[in-house]
UniProtKB/Swiss-Prot annotation:
Zn(2+) binds at C29, C219, H244, E248. A motif ('KMSKS' region) lies at residues 275-279. The gene is cysS. SMART domains: DALR_2. This is Cysteine--tRNA ligase. ATP binds at K278. Belongs to the class-I aminoacyl-tRNA synthetase family.
Length: 484
């Protein structure tokens, strides 16, 4: 069966045909490293990890680029607020610290490292080159107020709106720059002139004046720098479709680059039936999620829904994932013990070293726009059949089904017996630690409400000495283990 993917630009399922036979180039919008990672970031990264693993299983050589937006208004603003509160952290130090938090969270979930992970600040020259081309082609203009701002001229590009199928007249005003020198409210910033009071380290020289890049131009530059002017797949969260991806597509095509051939968008996360957002105060941070269950359980949960659907998080979600994974783990353990010492002990390896074959039904599900829920159904059917074979004493059938299960969990990155998960499998100890830490956090909150700040600070210090970091936010206090 041919792999088919849902292309957001055409709003249809399309047969996937690589630009270069046997090779695939994927660009995924990575995080803006302004604050700690949350469940939405993890869900998005995992969706494209599943895609990458499936393409690799099919024998394709995959190059995956996931960027880091380390220069942005939000990064600068968060650093400034920290300094106003008495901190000393510069914007670039904040960005690097948060970037490491993302890297640790991705690694904990078994998300494969990208082939390239460029920072925006390392591609300033490439961004300026695209802007120069746009100005020369009549699709961008420098503000005439000497601010140093450069804008994309949306009126000059008739195809603007093609990704989201919007008419220009119906689009909302671009909110990424000061509108004072725009020709049209929909014009968006390609280059932002330096403003009084901003750190000098957040500006670079340019033909239009000292400043920094706009958000959208960053991804156009980094994707084409590492994948070429035309590449296979551009991915990201559904919330990035407009304006970010719409603007990326317009400026790249207007600059003369064919750009991405397929556009994929993963769904968002709902918490207790509500869309997760900072404004609602219901953000679920990665550290809290990873502290509440084994990382392989979290991975199972995050990857269990179809990548385009909304992922529903509720109180029993991780317990359900734990139970499902336990069934797989129990069968793999049980079958390993029963088959030990028999002629069915080891699954035959492919003579050419290729990945173990998966059942046809599993492959058909994955080829159908990565239908992981259907693939998991095939996996659990195999587990049930394998247990039945063991009960009946049919070791040959049990061994065959065990090989199928092992191949499927390997493709999905959820093999509970893999070495990468063994270091985090001490669930009783984790539960005990979580209960103790949350009890101390509750005591600290009570002290703060009673304005006993000395006690609150002492509790925080005691936890810090034990290797526990507390992060306060409007939604409450969150904790993580130093180095994890």
């Amino acid at each position: 069966m041919t792999l088919r993917l849902h292309d957001s630009r055409t709003q249809s399922l399309r047969d996937f045909v690589p630009l270069v036979d046997g090779r695939v180039g994927i660009y995924v919008c990575g995080p803006t490293v302004q604050s700690a990672p949350h469940i939405g970031h993890l869900r998005s990264a995992l969706a494209y990890d599943q895609l990458r693993r499936w393409l690799t299983h099919r024998g394709l050589d995959v190059t995956l680029v996931r960027n880091v937006t380390d220069i942005d208004d939000k990064v600068i603003d968060n650093a400034r607020r920290g300094q106003e509160a008495g901190g000393t952290e510069e914007w670039w130090a904040l960005a690097y610290r948060v970037e490491l938090e993302f890297s640790r969270a991705y690694s904990a979930l078994g998300i494969l490292p990208p082939s390239y992970e460029p920072r925006a600040t390392a591609s300033i020259g490439e961004m300026q080159e695209i802007i120069r081309r746009l100005v020369e082609r009549g699709h961008a203009y420098a503000a005439d107020d000497r601010s140093g701002d450069v804008y994309f001229d949306t009126a000059s590009w008739p195809e603007y709106g093609e990704l989201t199928r919007q008419r220009a007249a119906d689009m909302e005003a671009a909110a990424d720059a000061d509108p004072r020198a725009k020709r049209d409210v929909r014009d968006f910033a390609l280059w932002k002139g330096a403003k009084p009071g901003e750190p000098a380290s957040a500006s670079w020289p340019s033909p239009w004046g000292s400043g920094r890049p706009g958000w959208h131009i960053e991804c156009s530059a980094m994707s084409t720098r590492y994948l070429g002017a035309e590449f296979d797949i551009h991915g990201g969260g559904l919330d990035l479709r407009f304006p970010h991806h719409e603007n990326e597509l317009a400026q790249s095509r207007a600059a003369g680059d064919p750009f991405a051939r397929y556009w994929l968008h993963n769904g968002l996360v709902a918490v207790a039936g509500q869309k997760m957002s900072k404004s609602l105060g219901n953000s679920l941070f990665a550290a809290d999620l990873l502290a509440s269950a084994r990382p392989v359980v979290v991975r199972y949960f995050l990857g269990s829904a179809h990548y385009r659907s909304t992922l529903e998080f509720h109180d029993g979600a991780l317990a359900e994932a734990e139970a499902a994974l336990d069934r797989i783990e129990t069968f793999l353990d049980r079958s390993a013990r029963r088959l030990a010492g028999t002629r069915f002990q080891a699954a035959p390896a492919a003579p050419d070293g290729s990945p173990a074959a998966v059942p046809d039904e599993f492959a058909e599900a994955m080829d159908d726009d990565l239908s992981v829920p259907q693939a998991l159904a095939v996996l659990h059917d195999a587990v049930r059949a394998g247990n039945a074979a063991l009960d009946a004493g049919d070791l040959q059938e049990a061994a065959s089904l065990r090989a199928d299960v092992s191949a499927m969990v390997a493709v999905l990155g959820i093999d509970p017996l893999a070495d990468e998960w063994r270091t985090a499998s001490d669930q009783p100890a984790r539960r005990a630690l979580q209960a103790l830490v949350e009890h101390r956090i509750a005591e600290r909150q009570t002290a703060r409400e009673a304005r006993d700040f000395a006690l609150a600070d002492r509790i925080r210090q005691e936890l810090a000495e034990a290797g526990i970091t507390i992060e306060d936010s409007p939604g409450g206090s969150h904790w993580s283990i130093d180095g994890e």
